[in-house]
Amino acid sequence: MKNNFDDISAIIKDRIKNFDQKIDRSEVGKVISIGDGIALVSGLDKVENSEVVIFDNDVYGLALNLEEEAVGVALFGNSNLISEGDSVRRSGQVISVPVGEAMLSRVVDSLGKPIDGKGPIKSSKMAKIFKLAPGVMTRKEVNQPLETGIIAIDSMIPVGKGQRELIIGDRQTGKTAIAIDTIINQKGKNVYCVYVAIGQKNSTVAQIVQKLNDTGSMDYTTVVVAGASESAPQQYIAPYTGVTIAEEFMSQGKDVLVIYDDLSKHAIAYRTLSLLLRRPPGREAYPGDVFYLHSQLLERAARLNKKYGGGSITAFPIIETQQGDISAYIPTNVISITDGQIFTKESLFNSGQRPAVDVGFSVSRVGSAAQTKAMKSVVGSLKLELAQYNEMLAFAQFGSDLDENTKAILEHGAKVYELIKQDQYSPISQADQAVILIGVKERIINIVPKEWISEYRNQVIKYLQKDPDGKVIESNIINEGIISKENYAKLEQALVKICKSIVSSIPNYDASMHKSLPEKYLETKEVDNV
């Protein structure tokens, strides 16, 4: 009997010794009111700003307004599932999304959940979407080109890795087309891409995803979608989700391109959210912190120095203007935050100039620092020549008596504008662009009529990609980043030959109607008037 008592006593002592009382503490509040996707909650006294809270029926919300009596919560789920008196508890966490290689070639919503029907995302790493931007001492100057594949941009408005370049213009002027062409052009260049669709039609996003799949560009791209049918809170967090996915790649020393399409709708979503939360409205009913909304987002784009991995995020925010008014509130805000803008103009678009980039209004504050030596050597005064052309064009409308110099400027400018026309989804490498522009710089295209300039461009690309000599020169330019004197001379001869070949194939070509080749290219025997 005594032995049994001793055994029982030992068991009790052992259990007391190993007893671990776990207290499950959770701060729980009650829903006071609900409406328009906003819940007013009481009892969450210690909730933090931007913390995720969980309602009954597993509906999630974001704590945005922290007041003395109540907390304003923006809902991510169906507000019809919540009613007054329902309980709500803190999660103790801010919004986190999956990041890493598993996100590539996937289409996700603003919470990082897959919506492409390809099954769950197998990512072991999560990252918070609200972070501070990299500090000053972690950054490096922008001096490497990010090739868009668009002649008008790469030659006159160069974009560098780590830059924030705004694409701004009226609706239906080709802003998204520029962004998608840039994504397609990153194929084989070891640049990851994140496309964030904010407030876009689902049919439009589906077309974009299909095109990226067709071109093989989805292999290195993640698409984040907060469509027009999504709630304001989901549209509000979408760009932060996109840049968080990009930051993971940047931290690994990789280069990333992020496109926000578009931040006008993002600002409207934030305005809607703020007004529903009864925050005081400011100019155009936007809240007072709408500038910070975009600056904190765009400052997360950077090029890091080697100590921090040497990766970069290049941001292409898109802004839609009304009737070309770039002096409105949101456009001026984003212009002041970014490192330049690509301005698309409706009149250019309607006249057939595609992409409809207004070279005069567009600017890159990084400039030629983001260009290869090959491109720098041939661009020269191209932008100035087009500015002179536009100025002369305005004067030419008032009179027909023009001197020879003015006629030459007008003819040359018209040919350059024809040269920078480019079909969508057909990017051109910077090496090929540089060679094409030699013909402009050296005035070799003088003898080619404006209507045949596109043929000149096509023949140059064909020469560089098919001709044995051309392939060697193209390879040298890509590898070395410069055009040697020897190669430059060879290219001049090849371009003269191409232009003469085009001219000889034009029926009823009259050489007297066009300027001749510069003297250094003229043979002792005059060029035949074919």
From Swiss-Prot:
A GO CC term attached to the entry: plasma membrane
Enzyme class: translocase
Annotated residues for binding of ATP: G169, D170, R171, Q172, T173, G174, K175, T176
Pfam families: ATP-synt_ab (PF00006), ATP-synt_ab_C (PF00306), ATP-synt_ab_N (PF02874)
Catalytic activity: ATP + H2O + 4 H(+)(in) = ADP + phosphate + 5 H(+)(out)
Source domain of life: Bacteria
GO molecular function: ADP binding; ATP binding; proton-transporting ATP synthase activity, rotational mechanism
Assembly with partners or alone: F-type ATPases have 2 components, CF(1) - the catalytic core - and CF(0) - the membrane proton channel. CF(1) has five subunits: alpha(3), beta(3), gamma(1), delta(1), epsilon(1). CF(0) has three main subunits: a(1), b(2) and c(9-12). The alpha and beta chains form an alternating ring which encloses part of the gamma chain. CF(1) is attached to CF(0) by a central stalk formed by the gamma and epsilon chains, while a peripheral stalk is formed by the delta and b chains.
Protein name per its UniProtKB record: ATP synthase subunit alpha
Organism annotation: Mycoplasmopsis synoviae (strain 53)
Record lineage: Bacteria, Bacillati, Mycoplasmatota, Mycoplasmoidales, Metamycoplasmataceae
